[in-house]
A protein has these predicted regions:
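N-terminal acidic leader/helix
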Residues: 1-23
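Short alpha-helical "recognition helix" segments of helix-turn-helix
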Residues: 27-28
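Short, charge-rich amphipathic interface segments used for partner binding and complex assembly
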Residues: 32-57
Length: 57
């Protein structure tokens, strides 16, 4: 289960990406999450995934 609050979700996802995964697809596959769901939730708060930085900015 992932956090619903956008600020907590941002921190959760970026921490996972930094510490455990080389990209968002790997994280989603491993955690059985839908990439689109995460991107949609975070985009509502103005965040977008940067493949170059491997984080939402």
């Amino acid at each position: 289960m992932i956090p619903n609050d956008p600020a907590i979700l941002l921190s959760f996802v970026n921490t996972k990406l930094r510490d455990f995964y080389s990209n968002l697809d790997d994280m989603c596959d491993d955690m059985e999450l839908e990439r689109k769901t995460i991107e949609d939730k975070l985009s509502l708060s103005g965040y977008k995934y940067s493949e170059e930085r491997n984080q939402f900015i």
